[in-house]
Amino acid sequence: MELSVLLLLALLTGLLLLMARGHPKAYGHLPPGPRPLPILGNFLQMDRKGLLKSFLRLQEKYGDVFTVYLGPRRTVMLCGIDAIREALVDNAEAFSGRGKIAVVEPVFQGYGVVFANGERWKTLRRFSLATMRDFGMGKRSVEERIQEEAQCLVEELRKTEGVLQDPTFFFHSMTANIICSIVFGKRFGYKDPEFLRLMNLFYVSFALISSFSSQMFELFHSFLKYFPGTHRQVYNNLQEIKAFIARMVEKHRETLDPSAPRDFIDAYLIRMDKEKAEPSSEFHHRNLIDTALSLFFAGTETTSTTLRYGFLLMLKYPHIAERIYKEIDQVIGPHRLPSLDDRAKMPYTDAVIHEIQRFGDLLPIGVPHMVTKDICFRGYIIPKGTEVFPILHSALNDPHYFEKPDVFNPDHFLDANGALKKNEAFIPFSIGKRICLGEGIARMELFLFFTTILQNFSVASPMAPEDIDLTPQEIGVGKLPPVYQISFLSRGGC
């Protein structure tokens, strides 16, 4: 008994000493931040409304670069376009590491192009960019794929005959099929039961990853991982998707012709076979599955969620939708397919799409980076291995760059002559070496899908515009729009 009392006293004394010391001195002069508690970190400074609210409040007190302890994890937050650009572009190599998202870490464990680090990441990113270019990303062929998929959606929407719909499934299916065509070499019918199951898994998983419980898991995952929670459902969902991808890989193996690769998986299998004698090769089964999952997840969720926000905003602001209808009618007309060449002639529609991305703010706290070496940044020392969050919300809502950031206003992207203007704080895909792999294809999809739908349909809601609520369903790693109902009413179209 005496020994246990002594041990307890020693533990309490140690905790008190840590509390008295505040920030660990061994790491030099870290950016400022609230004093952490042992184990709990800055839990007491966290807002009940989630991590984003917490970080924005701390920014007001500590400035654009500050230190936060997410439980025992030391992290640095970057706020505003200047700090984010200085880190991710001006010091690109030092900030090019990938941090962890606790709720998906057990699934990826540092594999796959998104969550890899070091030479693994560089190798997989080079291969992924080159291969996706070879199979159409950024070329006319992918434009044709998007146009064809948009027409498939138009046919599905015509079948609804103006009946109120939740558009989530339609937008998920449409965007997923573009990635499927590049990665798997095929598209799926909208009623395919396996495809329907996948779409549901993606939707549910993204909502869970962005939930408040997952944000709490981010702080205390080393403890909470032993208990039931949303993290286990996320794990099970993503494992089921990985099992589907593995089945697709096996089908590709059985029918592979090395002289005529059909898609991303074929190209990877050919490279894998070439390097099979190299024990250190990164081209192995695990990296293939996790890279395909990363491309599939990111390529589906980002664009489809942006479109969900976009059409909700069209219901909220019908006068903006009317201007888009007019521009579509003037530039494209009713009888031909919208093309990427039309974008330069449609500055208002392009500005609306930019503003949807800005206002939608899909990844408000960004995907965490990690510094690859000790670095002096703005007079502070950030030690190697420190996770860094580029708070994209702080750039997309900076009043120095967007006059009224809380208001949806396409004029944020129009000059005095009505032409599209660039804004350096517009970074929905992040910036630097870790910029979203699919930025190019996402921009194409948003323009072609958005204009094709509004060329063929006007949109309506049973609710008055002033009664439509834009309050997000979740704000965490991702920001999800509320669930809503919409009618697609035929305008004649193609």
Swiss-Prot record:
What chemistry does it catalyse, as a reaction equation?
an organic molecule + reduced [NADPH--hemoprotein reductase] + O2 = an alcohol + oxidized [NADPH--hemoprotein reductase] + H2O + H(+)
Q: What induces it?
A: By phenobarbital.
Q: Which GO terms describe its molecular function?
A: arachidonate epoxygenase activity; heme binding; iron ion binding; oxidoreductase activity, acting on paired donors, with incorporation or reduction of molecular oxygen, reduced flavin or flavoprotein as one donor, and incorporation of one atom of oxygen
List the GO terms this entry assigns under cellular component, sorted alphabetically.
Answer: cytoplasm; endoplasmic reticulum membrane; intracellular membrane-bounded organelle
Its record classes its membrane topology as: Peripheral membrane protein
Principal localization reads endoplasmic reticulum
- PTM annotation (Phosphoserine): residues: S128
**Family per record:** Belongs to the cytochrome P450 family.
Provide the protein name: Cytochrome P450 2B11
Can you name the source organism? Canis lupus familiaris
Lineage runs: Eukaryota, Metazoa, Chordata, Craniata, Vertebrata
